[in-house]
Amino acid sequence: MKIALLQCNTVTGDVAGNAERILAAVREAAAQGADLCVTPELALCGVAPGSYLRAEDFAEGCKAGLQMLADALQDGPPLLVGAPVASVYASGLLSNAAILVQKGRWSVVSRKVYQTYGQDSEARFFDRGVSCGILALDGWRLGVVLCQESATEDGAFWKTQYASGHNPLMELVQRGVDAIVHMAAVPFSKGVQRLSEQMLSHVAARHHVHLFSVNMVGGNDSRVYNGQSLAFDPTGQILARGKAFAEDVLLVDTAGSGGIVHPRPACLPEA
């Protein structure tokens, strides 16, 4: 399988413009023979949408953006795109979700189960999902997780308190998957890239699965996202690394030699 990790620089609130940006990246990936394209978390609406989520017409705008992608990609490769959708609960909130766009239609694959709390609390704006989803494609079972849901269940890197009372990553593994698809928006800080690579490599090797992680790039308010999307084989060996602080379409061929492993920036030895 050839998976394209679409390392996007999307604009918060510009749903129509973001849909066009994503579409251009998908077309570039399709020209390279991609079987599946994946965006970062919340790529359609832009990361950290905050109060936009409370606007009455925002949800409708996101639905229109998804339909635009579906209409434009009727003959294109399947696309997993991050976007807010209606919650499964009658709360009036939206859920942070992974959406499959394929053959002129779109459907929800997974709603984010684990949410952050505190100052940047996602729980203020989003309803959590019930469980992570699995996408069956070309003989593969792909478990889909959103950002912090990739945290290891064995506490090898940090302890994560799942507010939902269950561990989404471990439940996916127990259901049987061939690969983990990780849609992320991880802000840059000193050492974060090295830690991410160590943790995701550990997850791939521990559960003997391929792992594909696509990260946001660009800036939003005080946050900067460094991209450097990643792919690992089932031994935890790195197959590909995306560009740092730049948009990228990172194609990973699981049947071949993997993909391009871009170096970490020399000026950021701890990045």
Each language-model region and where it sits:
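Enzyme catalytic cores with a strong preference for nitrogen-chemistry domains
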Residues: 1-271
